[in-house]
């Protein structure tokens, strides 16, 4: 299986609450299906919907959907690099919109500081699965795809709603 990463940039910054109860969130399109992205991959909606449903049940609803600042070298979430917790992930057509709370962790503080200073950050999904090239040269993500995290925070955002190569592109992983 391959580590598969995708990057999207159009995220909105939201601050909720006042004073010491203030919480910072990012929100936007985290995943897209049935669309050939710029690195030639396509996630079938059936596969993506099934996996997002599993991810929501196993992680989001239980407060375990964590993401990191930057991309790590593997599919597992490293607690020492966690910057945010994904609080919602819902389907809107072929897009999956997400919302994530920036946490009061060392990496969360860095992300918060960057956002406060006006740095445009993107989000990038991370998962493992197989790729099969179709007749048109599109790499179709296989039914064995498993989402590791719906969103890591990354420094190199692409154009709005566009996928670009993740930094872990092409690395081989055994699940």
Q: Model regions: which residues?
A:
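Generic low-complexity segments that are intrinsically disordered, proline-rich and/or Lys/Arg-biased
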Residues: 45, 73-76, 158
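Amphipathic interaction/junction segments at domain boundaries or subunit interfaces
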Residues: 57-76
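Short, charged/polar surface micro-motifs in flexible loops or helix N-caps
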Residues: 35, 73-75, 104-106
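Residue microenvironments linked to proteolytic maturation
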Residues: 3, 12-28, 65-68, 78, ...
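Polar/acidic, low-complexity leader/linker segments enriched in S/T/G and N/D
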Residues: 1-62
């Amino acid at each position: 299986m391959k580590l598969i990463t995708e990057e999207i940039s159009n995220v909105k910054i939201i601050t909720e609450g006042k004073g010491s109860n203030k919480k910072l969130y990012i929100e936007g399109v985290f995943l897209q299906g049935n669309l050939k992205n710029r690195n030639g991959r396509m996630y079938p909606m059936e596969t993506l919907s099934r996996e997002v449903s599993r991810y929501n049940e196993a992680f989001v609803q239980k407060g375990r959907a964590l993401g990191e600042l930057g991309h790590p070298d593997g599919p597992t979430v490293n607690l020492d690099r966690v910057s945010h917790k994904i609080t919602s992930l819902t389907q809107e057509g072929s897009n999956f919109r997400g919302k994530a709370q920036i946490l009061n962790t060392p990496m969360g503080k860095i992300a918060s500081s960057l956002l406060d200073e006006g740095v445009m950050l993107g989000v990038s999904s991370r998962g493992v699965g197989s790729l099969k090239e179709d007749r048109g040269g599109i790499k179709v993500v296989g039914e064995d795809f498993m989402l590791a995290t719906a969103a890591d925070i990354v420094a190199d955002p692409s154009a709005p709603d566009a996928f670009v190569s993740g930094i872990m592109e092409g690395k081989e992983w055994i699940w």
